[in-house]
UniProtKB/Swiss-Prot annotation:
The histidine box domains may contain the active site and/or be involved in metal ion binding. It is a multi-pass membrane protein. The lineage of its organism: Eukaryota, Viridiplantae, Streptophyta, Embryophyta, Tracheophyta. Keywords: Endoplasmic reticulum, Fatty acid biosynthesis, Fatty acid metabolism, Lipid biosynthesis, Lipid metabolism, Membrane, Microsome, Oxidoreductase, Transmembrane, Transmembrane helix. The keyword Phosphoprotein does not apply. Expressed exclusively in the developing seeds. Not detected in leaves. A motif (Histidine box-1) lies at residues 95-99. CDD domains: Delta12-FADS-like (cd03507). One of its GO terms (biological process) is alpha-linolenic acid metabolic process. Pathway: Lipid metabolism; polyunsaturated fatty acid biosynthesis. This is Fatty acid conjugase FAC2 B. Fatty acid conjugase converting 18:2(9Z, 12Z) to calendic acid 18:3(8E, 10E, 12Z). Converts alpha-linolenic acid (18:3(9Z, 12Z, 15Z)) into 18:4(8E, 10E, 12Z, 15Z). Also has weak activity on the mono-unsaturates 16:1(9Z) and 18:1(9Z) producing two conjugated double bonds at delta(8) and delta(10) position.
Amino acid sequence: MGKAASAKKVLERVPISKPPFEYNDLKKAVPPHCFSRPLSRSLYFLFHDIIVTCILFYVASNYIHMLPRFLSCIVWPVYWISQGVFLGRLWMIGHECGHHSFSNYRWVDDTVGFLIHTATLTPYFSFKYSHRNHHAHTNSMEYDEVHIPKRKSEALYFEFLGNNPIGLMITMLCKLTFGYAAYIMFNYTGKKHKSGGLASHFYPQSPLFNDSERNHVLFSDIGICIVLYACYRIVTVTGAMPAFYVYGIPWVIMSAILFAATYLQHTHPSIPHYDTTEWNWLRGALSTIDRDLGFFNMNKTHYHVIHHLFPVIPEYHAQEATEAIKPILGQYYKYDGTPFLKALWREMKECIYVESDEGQKKQGIYWFKNKT
């Protein structure tokens, strides 16, 4: 198959008819050992990433500034990207903990997840609770939690104004730099809550949470405050610029990776969104897409369909589990191997809003479009 034909096939829409299989059919196809999550194996991956992260921090803190200026201008960006990737890998382990896919012990998962996410300035329990709602309502126009597309009827002046090479570049840079932080702080790309109030992951009274979760949200905030205070103390000793170089920029890289990965997993011309007249859980879970984000080297970013179907499966079993269900999924499974930056550019250009097709009998099914 030629490149043009292959690119066209990637953009073919997934079926919207009722799947010829049930959820239990998929579960039976997954090898039972894929659901096992031995603590020893999970700890191996955790300590591996912690050790690499600490080595990178140590080298950056003690040696890069000693290099000649022309050489440090090369080494610093290499460090920023490498450390950003490994911070992202650690963040993903914390995300695994929130799904109880790190070990068989929930208290272990919550302890590890809290420590990791707090170190990466993510309120663990707050994100765990909102992310649970995302998995419960994936690709629902009304109830999903993140990356909810705009309808054509909504204000789109800014989106259309920026749909040109310069505008797209500015939009991409802004979203990659600030998108993740804006989501955590202000629920950017999240759903609109009818009850009002500040929809922030840092606000215990936020409509994102119910009453039984608010104390855990406060506990997460305390953890973040401790880390921020530690950062402040480090800055008073080392100065702002060294701290920004060693931790700040890698954190921005991590944030960009997380925003881009989740955006690409839920944004594609071939993937539909549904309103309440058409949505059901299986439809939503199947409306995700597997991508090859090789630079991240984390299976949860590659195999996202299986993650939404069975979030308890640990990332090191995700590939095997995916291969087991692909024959059953058939055309309902979507994979796009388009290179990362090319895919990000295409999706930001082509996926501006969603609307139902003209003449479509079922008006509750929405597809990405970009026509004015």
